[in-house]
Amino acid sequence: MVQIHEIGVPVRSVNWVQFYPGHSKTGDPCIYVIMGQQADNLFVLQIDPETGLFRQFVAETEGSNYPTATFMNRTNRLYIGGAYSGHLFCFDSEMDTLIDLGVINPANATFPCRIDEDNDGVLWIGSYGTADLTSYDPKTSQFTRYGRMDDVDMYNYPLANDDGKIACLIRMTQPHIVVFDPKNGEKKVVGPVTIKGQDTIDLRRCVDGKLYIDSSLGKFRIDGTEAVSVDMIPPPMAINRSLPDGSTFTFTDSDQYIYRKAEIHKPDGKVKSFDLNYESSGSDIFYNHAGPDGCLYGSSILPLHFFRYNPENNELVDLGKCSNAGGEAYSMANLNGKIYISSYPGATISEYDPSKPYHFGTQPGDNPRDVGRIDEISYRPRSTLAGPLGRIWTASIPDYGLWGGPLSCYDPQTGEKKAYYNICGDASCYTLAYLPDQELIAVGTTISGGSGTQPKVAQAILFLWDYKNEKKVWEGTLDRPVSTFNALLTGVDGRIYGTVTGGGKPSELFVFDPVTLKFTDHFPVPTGYPLDLGLQNGHDGKIYGFTSSCIYCLDPATLNIEVIVKGEFGIAGPIIGQNIYFSNGHRLQFAIIF
């Protein structure tokens, strides 16, 4: 069996960075910085603002990678909600350690959204998963779990009002406010119920200590369990980020998603600069791509760093920022010697020429150049295709709380962008393959909508798009339940090969004939779960595919499958030369298959 070889860790960055002024065990002023990472758990830096010296405290609970909710209370205790473990952590300066206080709400609160404090010092935590609400009393070290604040939506962002009631901003499909009374357990919707994509709404604490609803449907003050209409909303209450002497802290490289260079700005105008050489374990890899220059390019996730691996000299380089979308690149495609990078959030497109110097920006001449969102709905551009009409095409999951991910295109010559909304109803376009002989694009869909939604359709489909006449010419699906067409490939024989998942059935490979418009074959994938975008043509005319536990070879002539590499595989990658590349978490790897 073919062996797996290690290349290295392309990116070591951090995410969900927050900072607060505080004091150490000895009472000296310090800065607390909270950072997340994928290859290890979240951590806290305690920084001396005079010297830049720091100590690093890493959470010990497995799966606590992301500090998605943070709060510094009035007694200098720093609280952190960790995703996706759903645990609450506390850095107590008196104990001088990072403590795991326990699970917020077992099996329900995997992603803490916001932490706030009421007048009695009790913490209130809202979470993603079930839009639940939980309190934690530092005096008794007890959690009290109050359950869902909404029966449909999944995100809860609470704020404690001055009367002891808790206002919960519920997102994503119909954002609205729910007021919860801890004394009697009653909850009530107050103010407008908005629709994502049509209206706006936010919940704020203002300088008068009151909570307000600011929405496109009106402005309101929350009094008890009522929303009272107001003409104006006071300024928001500011969070103190200054040290006792008035000094402020900042990262000068935060716009590059690096967070290593820090500055302390003194009230007298003096500036102290520090390099923070903390340990970061590595950022997970989200996508791998074969560039036009024979190198492998890829994207880390949260934050998005663009990286390059050169097989000729084994050079592995973190190139840095390539998009104003800071999440991750979902897909890429090559056209006329350039790489087009499609990134989350917002399905933002960047254009990169590997033959020219690297200088990110948004202006002509920048390289990579961010040219903006491809449309107003697309958010997670799962597939990018180059070629038809000289354009870049994307298939995307829509924005949070929305359904109906479109097929969209961008013309690099003119800068024109176009989206075909509602092309598959409440499903989303997901995968793409080019049929040059038929002058069509094959589009595979998923039943999923944007994050925070439940599917409205039961079956994913494959459809053929006539890009010249801008219309569907055929659509259909397999005779089995399908949730997602998660890989599509035009084989050297002109047929479409793909993988489908979901519907309570084993995942399958299929063959589709674009001439007869029939699914001619379908059969189980080898062991494991088929990876997204996990199919490609090899130099030998065969098709190579990834599952979560193997790499396999499919002979189009016989449809025989041979497993050629066994192991663990997280993200599929390209064939370059004799090697096939892939990644597991933060590690880039390859196997020699030719």
Give the residues covered by each predicted segment:
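Surface loop/turn motifs at the tips and blade-to-blade linkers of beta-strand repeat domains
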Residues: 6-13, 58-62, 102-107, 146-151, ...
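Repeated scaffold domains used in trafficking and secretory/extracellular systems
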Residues: 12-23, 64-70, 109-115, 152-160, ...
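Conserved beta-propeller blade signature
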Residues: 30-34, 77-80, 123-125, 166-169, ...
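Residue-level signature of beta-propeller blades and closely related beta-rich strand-turn architectures
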Residues: 37-38, 84, 129, 172-173, ...
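A short loop-to-beta-strand structural motif that recurs across blades of beta-propeller domains
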Residues: 43-45, 87-89, 132-134, 176-178, ...
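Short loop/turn segments that connect beta-strands within beta-propeller blades
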Residues: 48-52, 92-96, 137-141, 181-185, ...
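Short, conserved, GDST-rich strand-edge loop motifs in beta-rich repeat architectures
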Residues: 394-404, 443-459
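Blade-level signature of beta-propeller repeat domains, shared across WD40, Kelch, NHL, RCC1
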Residues: 566-594
